[in-house]
Regions:
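Conserved phosphate-binding elements of NTP-dependent enzyme cores
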Residues: 1-840
Length: 840
């Protein structure tokens, strides 16, 4: 015992990192305390994620995986090994990434959290089951024992369905929709191209693209006049066009080769609807689906009503309801319902019921602690926000009470209202109390204040970052003059940057008004949005912000501008002179490594033209097209201009490494030899310039008027640290949003509305200041801005706030307060208002 105690007393207290050089890290040495919460702060691009994920997670997970067989490792995604001299005393590590993948069509909140597994087990083992003759048998232990059930009414013997038979991704799937809850239906409104055209002139769109041109001749043989405008046909004729029977007709037709001889044959009539249905049945790939999709619309499955379950799976009843009805409940509602399950069963079944229900409730508690009680189990996974998916990921990782694990959290505050962050902090403290260590990368001062130790990276981004500029407790960082986050942690900074617009002037430029009916958990709304102002939509997670703005306002405005029918739940909308609607969201830009910052910002094309005019290029006969790393002669022949090559390593996953020929520059050796000399006498090749960040490239491009102007816009957007050759799919959500804005800056925008969905994702408080300046510049040019946001500094600088709530799910969905930040802070109903003080 004495030896064991002595060993524990001498146990290491910190992870020791020595000589870390991942990405932009400058050979740093740093100690990360064990058994506590450590925050890693710093401006965007300063090296926070490089330290947390590139070093700590890569080493912690890599060493654990090395203990597994090569056969097992081959089937696991592995982080690249860190470029570091030494990492000592690191535990096995789990990482929760900033942007979890968007789930597929078969995923729901219930499947993603595995709550549905527990629910299926309940309905299989504990429910009343229906016999083949329609009689219900009371709950029995025979189901768990694998025995047959006997109907007390008709005496028939049968087996209860297993949990597998209650899965909509397996045997319990609805036969009509295959377990997706949605079916493709023919969109009749898309079948007629133009009612002023005749059928001979191509009025029936599917017959032009999906069917032989002879169908107009067959239609004529069906008794339909094909030489008059479609609108002038009788109802009977239109019925034949849309839904006529598939009968054979003997027709005469003129061959397309110009021959005067008429052909004749027997041909089956395919109505417009049948044409689309026939083409859909034959679809084998995405290309084929694309041809048909313009004539289709998605509708709720008429058989399962969107529940995804088969009729058989919907038959078992527990506490008076079926499994599909249980899935329609929110997490908060079903948690209360599950608590009552054991008491509703016979005495002998209660121990088993308490075990099954207890497991369900433990999983549910972790999710509810993270503020997800408003989500229903049948909510489609693809409709969940980034923050919701990240909290699901966190709940999955922490529900097993492990000890001695290093949890690396990459911006866990994404998408969280200040009130939800309190729940997140509670989960992190629980992890530490179980003997784990937590490292979190974040900018949110509310969550950073919970850390026992903070490591701040910097001082700036990219090549100007990668150093530890400050470390210590929250109080020590707050007093450290070298720290950039310190004043935000201590609260010693001005909150309001821009002047307050008087209440009577808020709507002086106009008003966009929208009325909606109920949808999801959102109640009927009557919203007024001031034109030419910065409006921030706030509220706790699930309060209806996304539904109001992204699912109602945007489709409503687009329909009104196109002169089309409004969506069913959008009752009326007044655009107030708006002609352009631009959604600036955080979806990745581009889908492969060929999309870079320079190409997206329209800088690369201009640089290619400039380099093609250089003396070296003219001597060798190179044109602008030759400088393209996608198709040009000067691209690297080894990697074909991607900058990376993929290695097929036997027994292990494929490994991507920088191209050994161009070292990631994407260009061949000939491109290196063509150098452009600026007015300062500095010479750079295009590959060298593409490897520079925006700030340094600006210094070289001062005499290139158009390039300089476009690079200055990127710098003003706070993207000066990005290299010109950086791949756009790898940018953070916040970086992607600001890059999308680059082409919009400096224009008159009086008729444009910009809608931002949480633009502060990944932004340091200093970067938020830059973003606010961008917002103000757009407003000064006449733009109307609507921002869905949780960041308190953005909310405090709004001209107008629409606060949704008061809670999430069924407890939200209403506009509970509108007005200036001061008015929201004074509102007793507003949860957001509680966190807005101080305002200045």
């Amino acid at each position: 015992m004495e030896k064991q105690y002595e060993k524990a007393a001498n146990a290491p207290s910190s992870i020791e990192v020595r000589g870390a050089r991942v990405h932009n890290l400058k050979n740093i040495d740093v100690d990360i305390p064990l058994g506590t919460i450590t925050g890693i702060a710093g401006v965007s691009g300063s090296g926070k994620s490089s330290l947390a994920l590139g070093v700590l997670y890569a080493e912690g997970s890599g060493r654990y995986l090395e203990a597994l067989s090569t056969y097992t490792r081959r089937r696991m995604t592995q982080a690249a090994r860190a470029d570091v001299d030494e990492v000592l005393y690191i535990p096995a590590a789990l990482a929760l990434h900033q942007r979890p993948a968007v789930p597929g069509i078969r995923s729901t909140f219930g499947t993603g959290t595995e709550l549905l597994n527990g629910l299926r087990l309940m309905y299989s083992r504990l429910a009343s089951h229906e016999c083949p003759n329609g009689h219900y048998v009371l709950p029995s232990l025979n189901v768990a024992a694998g025995k047959e059930l006997t109907c007390p009414v008709c005496g028939v013997h049968f087996h209860a369905p297993s949990a597998e038979e209650l899965s909509f991704n397996s045997q319990g799937a609805c036969r009509t929709c295959g377990g997706t809850g949605m079916v493709h239906m023919v969109d009749r409104a898309s079948l007629i191209l133009d009612e002023n055209l005749s059928i001979d002139a191509g009025a029936v769109a599917p017959w032009k693209t999906l069917m032989w041109s002879l169908m107009t001749d067959v239609c004529r043989a069906m008794g339909v006049r094909t030489d008059i405008p479609f609108k002038d046909l009788t109802d009977e004729e239109k019925e034949i066009v849309y839904d006529g029977p598939a009968v054979k007709k003997h027709i005469f037709y003129r061959p397309k080769n110009g021959s005067n001889e008429a052909g004749e044959l027997d041909f089956t009539y395919y109505s417009a609807v049948h044409t689309v249905e026939n083409a859909l049945a034959k679809v084998k790939d995405d290309k084929g689906m694309k041809r048909v999709s313009r004539f289709l619309k998605e509708e709720t499955c008429p058989d399962c009503q969107g529940s995804r379950f088969s009729e058989t799976a919907r038959k078992p009843h527990l506490r008076g309801i079926s499994i599909d009805e249980a899935c329609r409940m929110t997490l908060g509602e079903i948690t209360e319902w599950v608590k009552g399950v054991p008491e509703s069963l016979p005495e002998e079944m209660r121990p088993m019921a308490e075990s099954i229900c207890g497991s369900f409730l433990r999983t549910a508690k972790g999710l509810m602690d993270l503020g997800l009680s408003y989500l229903s189990l049948d909510r489609a996974g693809s409709t969940l926000s980034t923050g919701e998916r990240q909290r699901m990921q966190l709940a999955r990782a922490v529900r097993n009470r492990t000890t001695g694990v290093l949890y690396v959290l990459d911006e866990p505050s994404i998408g969280l209202h200040p009130s939800n962050i309190e729940g997140l902090c509670g989960v992190m403290k629980d992890l530490v109390s179980d003997g784990n260590s937590v490292v979190l990368v974040d900018h949110d001062t509310q969550i950073l204040k919970e850390a026992s130790w903070i490591v701040e990276m910097g001082p700036d981004a990219g090549s100007d970052g990668g150093n530890v500029i400050a470390e210590g407790t929250v109080e020590e960082i707050g007093k450290n003059p070298k720290s950039k986050i310190g004043r935000f942690l201590s609260g010693n900074y001005p909150r309001r940057v821009f002047p307050v617009i008087p209440k009577e002037e808020i709507f002086s430029e106009g008003c966009i008004r929208m009325k909606t009916g109920p949808i999801h958990t959102v109640k009927p709304l009557d919203a007024e949005i001031p034109k030419g102002r910065l409006t921030v939509v706030t509220g706790v997670s699930g309060s209806g912000k996304t539904t109001m703005v992204l699912e109602s306002l945007i489709p409503g405005l687009l329909a009104a501008l196109a002169g089309e029918k409004l969506l069913g739940h959008v009752l009326s909308i007044d655009p107030s002179g708006i002609k352009n609607v631009k959604l600036i969201d955080s979806t990745p830009i581009g889908i492969n490594v060929r999309s870079t910052v320079a190409t997206y910002a329209n800088v690369h094309d201009e640089l290619r033209k400039i380099y093609a005019r250089s003396e070296g290029a003219r001597e060798k006969g190179f044109k602008a097209g030759d400088f393209s790393y996608n198709t040009g002669k000067l691209r690297c022949p080894v990697c074909d201009g991607t900058g990376v090559i993929s290695l097929d390593v036997q027994f292990l996953p494929d490994v991507e490494i920088p191209c050994p020929s161009c070292h990631g520059s994407r260009y061949g050796k000939d491109a290196e030899g063509i150098r452009l000399v600026n007015k300062k006498g500095e010479a750079r090749s295009l590959p060298e310039l593409m490897d520079m960040d925006v700030n340094h490239a600006l210094g070289f491009c001062q005499d290139m008027k158009l390039v300089k102007r476009r690079l200055e816009v990127l710098r003003e957007l706070g993207l000066g640290y990005l290299t010109l050759g950086e791949e756009t799919p790898g940018l953070s959500g916040g970086e992607a949003q600001r890059l999308k804005l680059a082409s919009e800056m400096g224009r008159a925008q009086e008729d444009t509305i910009f809608i931002f969905d949480e633009p502060t994702i990944g932004l340091h408080p200093l970067d938020v200041r830059t973003l606010l300046s961008v917002f103000r510049a757009l407003v000064d040019h006449g733009a109307t801005l609507i921002v869905i946001e949780h960041d308190l500094d953005v909310i405090r600088n709004a001209d107008y706030i629409i606060d949704m709530g008061p809670g999430g799910g069924e407890e939200g969905g209403r506009i509970i307060a509108c007005g200036s930040p001061e008015e929201i802070a004074d509102s007793p109903k507003s949860i957001t208002g509680k966190y807005l003080r101080p305002l200045k």
